[in-house]
């Protein structure tokens, strides 16, 4: 039997006044989406002088104001956070949400997240090494009551985690990764692997890919993850394949037909979770050259017309 499809919304409500952020998240929940995700940056990445709330604090508040939808950060980085603190934050949200946390982790790379928090910018090799240690710490702390870890970059000594996670053995772990080094970490630890429908190099260059090129790139990543899973002794099917959509020229937000076509093409190569951007209207035009996002009408149409058919 094929794996159940899941559909989420990436909604950067950190940009919005808190009461509006709550309303928007409750609206997504009411429509029946499976998950809702926040970003994690110190500064607003679209308009640098606009508001930007901290992700874990806001996620905890949203957890207390929703009841069904699963909640996560896509993805939380360790640039300004010790891994033990991330584990404790995750456990707290896990309990506030009554077991609805999706734990999303990534290596982080935005320069302003370093400079604005007084953390020197890491070289790529150090970033990956730090990420590997951090994931190992968080994974262990959320599984066990006591953790000791002696790494090159992070040390945890007799760290106590009580109460235990409501979800066992820990909240589901999503690792965002597109390069070989971080995908190998995903192969070892993740329950779900998330990637973009574009390569990181093309994203940094501000490109959007034609549909078939993007599909081919995702298929190549998918095959690589299978290979890395086998090397660490895991079954490839143990890791859900998750896609953050909107970087292609032909976007799923164009129409209901485009949405169906997008989902079917990526489902055919093994993706079973789809996360779509919904930005506030005043931001959509600012990112249009790099990112295709949903508007409210499309958020509603997909929920009422497409999701019941696809599930």
Q: Model-derived features: where do they sit?
A:
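Active-site-adjacent structural elements that line small-molecule/cofactor binding pockets in enzymes
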Residues: 1-311
């Amino acid at each position: 039997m094929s794996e159940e499809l899941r559909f989420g919304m990436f909604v950067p409500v950190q940009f919005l006044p808190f009461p509006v952020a709550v309303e928007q998240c409750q609206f997504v929940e009411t429509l029946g989406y499976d998950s809702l995700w926040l970003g994690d940056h110190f500064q607003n990445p679209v308009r640098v002088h606009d508001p930007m709330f901290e992700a874990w604090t806001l996620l905890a508040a949203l957890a207390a104001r929703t009841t069904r939808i699963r909640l996560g950060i896509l993805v939380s980085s360790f640039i300004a956070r010790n891994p033990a603190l991330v584990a404790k934050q995750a456990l707290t949200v896990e309990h506030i949400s009554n077991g609805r946390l999706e734990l999303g982790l990534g290596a982080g790379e935005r320069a302003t997240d370093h400079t604005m928090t007084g953390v020197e910018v890491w070289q790529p090799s150090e970033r990956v090494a730090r990420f590997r240690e951090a994931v190992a710490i968080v994974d262990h702390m959320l599984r066990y009551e006591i953790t000791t870890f002696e790494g090159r970059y992070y040390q945890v000594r007799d760290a106590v985690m009580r109460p235990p996670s409501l979800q066992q053995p820990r909240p589901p772990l999503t690792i965002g990764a597109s390069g070989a080094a971080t995908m190998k970490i995903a192969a070892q630890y993740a329950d779900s692997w998330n990637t973009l429908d574009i390569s990181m190099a093309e994203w940094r260059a501000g490109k959007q890919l034609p549909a078939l090129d993007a599909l081919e790139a995702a298929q190549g990543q998918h095959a690589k993850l299978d290979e890395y899973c086998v090397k660490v002794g895991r079954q490839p099917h143990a890791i859900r394949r998750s896609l953050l959509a909107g970087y292609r020229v032909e976007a799923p937000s164009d129409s209901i037909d485009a949405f169906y076509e997008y989902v079917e093409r990526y489902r055919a190569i093994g993706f079973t979770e789809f996360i779509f951007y919904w930005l506030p209207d005043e931001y959509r035009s600012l990112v249009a050259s790099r990112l295709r996002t949903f508007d409210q009408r499309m958020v509603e149409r997909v929920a009422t017309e497409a999701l019941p058919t696809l599930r």
